Design a protein with these regions (language model features):
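Perimembrane helix-loop-helix junctions
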Residues: 54-61, 221-243
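Aromatic-anchored transmembrane helix interface
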Residues: 48-50, 70-84, 94-122, 135-142, ...
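Hydrophobic transmembrane alpha-helices and their immediate junctions
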Residues: 345-379
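A membrane-periplasm/extracellular boundary helix in multi-pass inner-membrane enzymes
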Residues: 231-277, 295-299
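Transmembrane alpha-helices of multi-pass inner-membrane enzymes
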Residues: 377-384, 391-417
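Transmembrane signal-anchor hairpin modules in multi-pass inner-membrane enzymes, especially those
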Residues: 1-94, 121-131, 135, 184-192, ...
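Alpha-helical transmembrane segments of multi-pass inner-membrane proteins
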Residues: 28-29, 113-156, 165-233, 256
Length: 417
């Protein structure tokens, strides 16, 4: 009944419907395509797509509200975006010593609000008009991989970063577009699609290894293998071949990049050892220090506080506990954990809204759409949110949202009707 209602929404011809059908999906595709080369232009495309989606939602408000189960994720995104804006306008001062923190929350708030409307529009376009732009999605991944390998070979960069600058952001983007294009490959009507998938799996994994981002090196192989195995789970021979093929691909990557992986594992062990010796001025040690100090700072301001107040509390903690000193170096950015960063600045309301978003994504992925791709993207979002922030970063939030929106056209319960 829910799906039938959803599909009826796109049947009434109108200018706004035509705009949504002709512009929203191309807007999502163009945003993803341009992002690894220019995050500024990608942002403009996203804002244009979001503005068109606002127009569509405003002219279809009654029918959109009727499909209540499809409102959960957009409402949570909208609430988080509005909360971020309220926090920004309440605490920001022009002479702030931490402008990056405020600017990041402001821009991510805009992305979250417009993303909510884009997702609403995508979910309410009728099934027969939902585009499955397989070749465009695959092409986007090819261009992103080409740029990544170009940087590795000719730019002299130790860790590739695409246009984002930081290798971690590049790894996250490659994970999202890699998962999306992997599913697109599996939708092809070709006897060679599984071989193409394994080649794609190899190339994306290699590109992520070139970023040397530990979280992504762990997460993407799970995401990629899960998508493939979920697709062939009803055929035992195919499942066995897929398992062997994905395992062989990972073993090949381990062999080709054994020095890189060995070095990153050693760095992890050394960082943990340093933290045990009260030295938190390492990558892992600083994260542990940020988690502890962020929780303690949030507990002292359960209804929220400014970035300056949080910084003062964490500096005071570091003076009393030297093992928390590593957190001080990151006070002008974020605390490298989605929930803790939200809790430390927006208090319990901010943390609760974030948990509600995760819960709504879980409910939608497993009980509404029933999509293994949506579940894989949720897994990536959760795992990256443990040691970094995605919703706090405008570019990564946009990339994840566009991948999630386009992913609803590729797999799921209602595509089988």
């Amino acid at each position: 009944m829910l799906n039938e209602l959803r599909y009826e929404l796109g049947k009434t011809p109108s200018i706004s419907s035509a705009v949504a059908l002709k512009a929203v999906f191309p807007g999502c595709l163009l945003t993803l395509a341009v992002m690894p080369f220019s995050s500024i232009i990608a942002g403009w495309l996203f804002y244009l797509t979001g503005s068109l989606s606002v127009f569509y939602v405003a002219t279809h408000l009654r029918t959109i509200i009727a499909a209540k189960r499809l409102l959960l994720i957009p409402l949570c995104l909208l609430a988080i975006g509005l909360t971020n804006l309220i926090w920004y306008h309440h605490y920001y001062q022009p002479d702030s010593l931490l402008p990056y923190v405020y600017n990041a929350y402001r821009t991510s708030a805009h992305a979250g609000i417009l993303g909510a409307f884009i997702l609403l529009t995508v979910l309410h376009i009728s099934q027969k008009n939902r585009q499955q732009p397989l070749f465009y999605i695959i092409a986007i991944c090819i261009f992103a991989l080409g740029y990544a390998f170009y940087q590795s070979l000719f730019s002299g960069m130790h860790r590739i970063g695409l246009v984002f600058g930081t290798a971690t952001s590049a790894a996250y983007f490659l994970t999202f577009i890699g998962a999306l294009s992997a599913q697109a490959l599996l939708k092809l009507n070709s006897t060679y699609k599984y071989y193409l998938y394994l080649g794609h799996f190899l190339l994306v994994t290699v590109a992520i290894l070139l970023t040397e981002t530990r979280a992504a090196i762990f997460v993407y192989p799970i995401v990629g293998a899960t998508i493939l195995l979920s697709e062939v789970r009803h055929s035992k021979p195919l499942f066995i071949k897929a398992f062997v093929g994905s395992s062989a691909t990972l073993l090949l990557c381990l062999f080709l990049f054994q020095e890189t992986i060995h070095q990153r594992v050693n760095d992890l062990i050394n960082d943990v050892h340093s933290y045990s010796m009260n030295n938190s001025r390492t990558s892992v040690g600083a994260r542990i220090a940020m988690y502890q100090s962020g929780i303690e700072a949030g507990e002292e301001a359960l209804l929220g506080q400014s970035a300056e107040q949080r910084a003062e509390r964490i500096v005071a903690q570091a003076e009393q506990k030297p093992n928390l000193a590593g957190a001080v170096e990151y006070l002008d950015v974020h605390l490298h954990n989605e929930v803790i960063d939200a809790f430390s600045l927006k208090g319990l309301p901010g943390a609760i809204l974030l948990v509600l978003l995760y819960a709504s994504l879980f409910y939608f992925s497993f009980f509404v759409l029933r999509s293994h791709l949506s579940a894989a993207l949720l897994f990536a979002l959760l795992m990256y949110g443990l040691s970094d922030v995605i919703l706090y970063s405008r570019d990564m939030l946009i990339a994840w949202l566009m991948a999630f929106c386009l992913g609803t056209t590729l797999t799921g319960k209602w595509l089988k009707n």
